[in-house]
Amino acid sequence: CRALPGKGPMLHNHDTNETFVAMTGTWRASWQNEKGKLEHVDLRPLDLVSFPPGASRRFMNVTRGPKNRYSILMFVIGGNAPSAEFTAESMHRLERAGVWPPRRGRR
């Protein structure tokens, strides 16, 4: 993944494990704990974190410095055909933004 500071996907989960390795910059890996509260750890170059199947997670570039400088995060999702699912909160955000459900003719 290559992203600018402040960017990253919404909270989601996979049916397999997912491992993140910060290659450049600082990345915040967040997850929802058993009580539904968000926890996080900040990753610096070559730091690694892995999430088990079903754990809701997200990551964001939190690098300080120029807002137009990309940082790189490597991620590995296990399995031959893993699926992904956004959390209910993320789906509501997509609906409010008008991008879900997809409208005919829009890509």
Set out the residue ranges of the language-model regions.
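Glycine- and acidic-residue-biased ligand/ion/polar-headgroup-sensing regions
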Residues: P5, D15-R28, Q32-E34
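Residue-level detector of conserved, well-ordered beta-strand and adjacent loop positions
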Residues: L4, M23, R44, M60
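Double-stranded beta-helix
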Residues: S56-R107
